[in-house]
């Protein structure tokens, strides 16, 4: 599992997918999220604006990343 460090209180799910390199564009992120391909903390999430905070895990196509605090 890869840690993705953020310097803010949260990052929106679609932005996290791009930032983590799990998808290339915002449009691709939107399609994946709305299609039910993304899990947040083990549950399918279809809200692209979902606020992901430190400690949350996001899974897409067998790849898992965890949001971590700070630089």
List each model region and its residues:
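A detector for short, charged/polar N-terminal pre-domain segments
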Residues: 1-11
């Amino acid at each position: 599992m890869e840690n993705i460090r953020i310097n803010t209180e949260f990052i929106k799910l679609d932005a996290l997918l791009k930032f983590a390199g799990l998808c290339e564009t915002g449009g691709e992120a939107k399609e994946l999220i709305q299609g039910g391909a993304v899990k947040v903390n083990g549950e399918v999430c279809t809200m692209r604006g979902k606020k992901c905070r430190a400690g949350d895990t996001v899974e897409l196509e067998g790849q898992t990343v965890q949001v971590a605090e700070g630089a």
